[in-house]
From Swiss-Prot:
Example of a GO biological process term: lipid A biosynthetic process
Name of the protein in question: UDP-3-O-acylglucosamine N-acyltransferase
Molecular function via GO: N-acyltransferase activity
This protein's UniProt keywords: Acyltransferase, Lipid A biosynthesis, Lipid biosynthesis, Lipid metabolism, Repeat, Transferase
EC number(s) from the headed UniProt entry: 2.3.1.191
Gene name for this UniProt entry: lpxD
Length: 342
């Protein structure tokens, strides 16, 4: 794969400084860039690295345009990181081999399934009765599409994705390998020392432009649907419980978990390994630090953390022991304050 700078500029815009005929064969970081690499600088504190890099071209903000031009070609744009993201999409699209349209002979597709224009169904995939696939949908090998599932146009499923009945995907979604959407939520009623299963009768609704990482699971609702808003980004190995609602353009890092019936607002982020307990509500613009456990609803936007800092084991044990005695220490402090007050 290679492209001249003028091709990048024509596709993505920005102000091009330097030789437009330079050939780019790689996108890479400043430190490992060579004379055929395009890189980017998103912050002025990396000015020194900009001067030292061997990159053929660097994407920079206007504040670094002069520095970049002194060392070689540059593309100047208000938001270099966003430009870099768009560049990776453009580059990947040129690298990607379009799958053949049509249904592979080894796939099993029910007679009443509706396939849009240009749909591709890979080997050993099963699509059950009543499913609807929009134009340009790509289903890779060994996927399972349950009865009545709806998949919006231009959505892509990697191998081994499972969509259970009652699942509706929006347009332009990307589901990575091993994703399971619409399995039963965890619902059981205790009765005389045993557990009685509560059948999960809802579905899962996923909005447009959602990306779901490998081996992430989203459970179907108990009665109402589980809802994933448009533009949501979910990393690998995330568990979303039944009846959860995640607002548009929120993002969650790997190994996070959201228990049943929790509601997460728009534009929220949840760090890796963080847990949101069931039936809680996070307002729009709430950001949860990695490994935190959210045990109460959060009504105001902002950054929230609930992580016990790491330490050597001996110190940690002492601090943990102190924490267990906080209520006693509080009572002793109150007693001392009363004695010392006039």
């Amino acid at each position: 794969m290679q492209a001249a700078l003028h091709e990048l500029h024509a596709a993505l815009g920005g102000e091009l400084l330097g030789d437009p005929s330079l050939v780019i064969r790689r996108i890479g970081p400043l430190a490992s860039a060579d004379a055929e690499t395009i890189s980017f600088v998103s912050n002025a504190r990396y000015r020194a690295q900009l001067a030292q890099t061997a990159a053929a071209c660097v994407i920079v903000a206007p504040a670094l345009a002069e520095d970049a031009a002194q060392r070689g070609a540059a593309i100047v744009t208000p938001d270099p990181y966003h430009y870099f993201a768009r560049l990776t999409q453009w580059w990947a699209a040129r690298l990607r081999v379009a799958p053949p349209s049509g249904v592979h002979p080894s796939a099993v597709v029910a007679a009443d399934v509706r396939l849009g224009e240009g749909v591709s169904v890979g080997p050993l995939t099963v699509i059950e009765a009543g499913a609807v696939l929009g134009d340009g949908v790509v289903i890779a090998s060994q996927c399972h599409i349950g009865a009545g599932v709806q998949i919006g146009a231009q959505t892509r499923l990697a191998p081994h994705v499972t969509l259970m009945p009652g699942t509706r995907l929006g347009q332009r979604c990307l589901l990575h390998g091993g994703v399971v959407i619409g399995a039963d939520g965890f619902g059981f009623a205790p009765h005389q020392g045993r557990w009685e299963k509560i059948e999960q009768l809802g579905g899962v609704v996923v909005g447009d432009d959602v990306e779901i990482g490998a081996n992430t699971c989203i459970d179907r609702g108990a009665l109402d649907d589980t809802v994933i808003g448009e533009g949501v980004k979910l990393d690998n190995l995330i568990q979303i419980g039944h009846n959860v609602q995640i607002g548009a353009h929120s993002a969650m890092a790997g190994c996070a978990g959201v228990a049943g019936s929790a509601r997460i607002g728009r534009g929220c982020t949840v760090g890796g390994g963080a847990i949101v307990l069931g039936h809680l509500e996070l307002a729009d613009g709430v950001h949860i630090s990695a490994a935190s456990v959210v045990m109460r609803s959060i009504k105001q936007p902002g950054q929230y953390s609930g992580v016990f800092p790491i330490d050597d084991n001996a110190s940690w044990e002492k601090n943990a022991a102190t924490l267990r005695q906080l209520h006693t220490l509080r009572d002793r402090l109150r007693t001392l304050e009363k004695k010392s007050s006039p």
